[in-house]
């Protein structure tokens, strides 16, 4: 636990499930005040809100599409209206779907790039604007992926979005470091989230994925949430412009593990 996170205001996009939900609950345990953004009426953000409160934090929910400027502005304004400020912005909302690149409709490309990359830009922009205008040494955390460095056939839109997030984060970190604003990425590997549930329910597919992870197991959302809490805390006060991979070693060329090559 990080005592300096107590009372901090954190907004998390895509927080109704998966990594976003785990991060919301972790910040609840840190006794932070959490703005839970969700996209679809099919999701139940109030369940997450209750878990955050039960964990020791405060929480509000706000619906919004991160590809829309006004919705993203409203997420930041909700934090300010409900809790008086914003300290930490976590741009977590993301999409993926497999399509052969030569068959990919432009609408699929636009949807993934819009959510993953443009959404992260809008969240970063609105948070940083507030930080600058109010002289706040705030914190932006973007959710990238191992696929900012590992090519991923059938997911060219996803890989491109994460590669874009990498350079966007590094650029923002360099631009706003003089103002004490930190901007970092988290790069998860294979994580046991709802988006992966069907794949990991198949023993063969699960084993195939595990074979690419030197540590030998698929990560849990709480392990990513722990990384987010550290990056947001004073313990990481000298850290900006990085991608912190939490991937069980997936980015470390696992095929060389047995001394091959």
Swiss-Prot record:
It comes from the Bacteria. The lineage of its organism: Bacteria, Bacillati, Bacillota, Bacilli, Bacillales. It holds the Pfam family adh_short_C2. Its EC number is 1.1.1.47. Keywords: NADP, Oxidoreductase, Sporulation. Substrate binds at residue 145. This is Glucose 1-dehydrogenase. The active site is at 158 (proton acceptor).
């Amino acid at each position: 636990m990080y005592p300096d996170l107590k009372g901090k205001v954190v907004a998390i996009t895509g927080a109704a499930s998966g990594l976003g939900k785990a991060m919301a609950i972790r910040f609840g345990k840190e006794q932070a005040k959490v703005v839970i953004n969700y996209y679809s009426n099919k999701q139940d953000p109030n369940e997450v809100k209750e878990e955050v409160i039960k964990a020791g934090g405060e929480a509000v929910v706000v619906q919004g599409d991160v590809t829309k400027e006004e919705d993203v502005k409203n997420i930041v304004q909700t934090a300010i209206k409900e809790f008086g400020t914003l300290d930490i912005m976590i741009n977590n909302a993301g999409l993926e779907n497999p399509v052969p690149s030569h068959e990919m409709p432009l609408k699929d490309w636009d949807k993934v790039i819009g959510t993953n990359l443009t959404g992260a830009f809008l969240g970063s922009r609105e948070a940083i604007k507030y930080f600058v205008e109010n002289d706040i040494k705030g914190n932006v955390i973007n959710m990238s992926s191992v696929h900012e460095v590992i090519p991923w056939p059938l997911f060219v839109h996803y890989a491109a979005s994460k590669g874009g997030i990498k350079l966007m984060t590094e650029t923002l970190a360099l631009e706003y470091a003089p103002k004490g604003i930190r901007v970092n990425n988290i790069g998860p590997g294979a994580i046991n989230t709802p988006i992966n549930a069907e794949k990991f329910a198949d023993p063969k597919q699960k084993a195939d994925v595990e074979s690419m992870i030197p540590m030998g197991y698929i990560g849990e959302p709480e392990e990513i949430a722990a990384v987010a809490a550290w990056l947001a805390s004073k313990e990481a006060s000298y850290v900006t412009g990085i991608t912190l991979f939490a991937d069980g070693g997936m980015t470390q060329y696992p095929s060389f593990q047995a001394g091959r090559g």
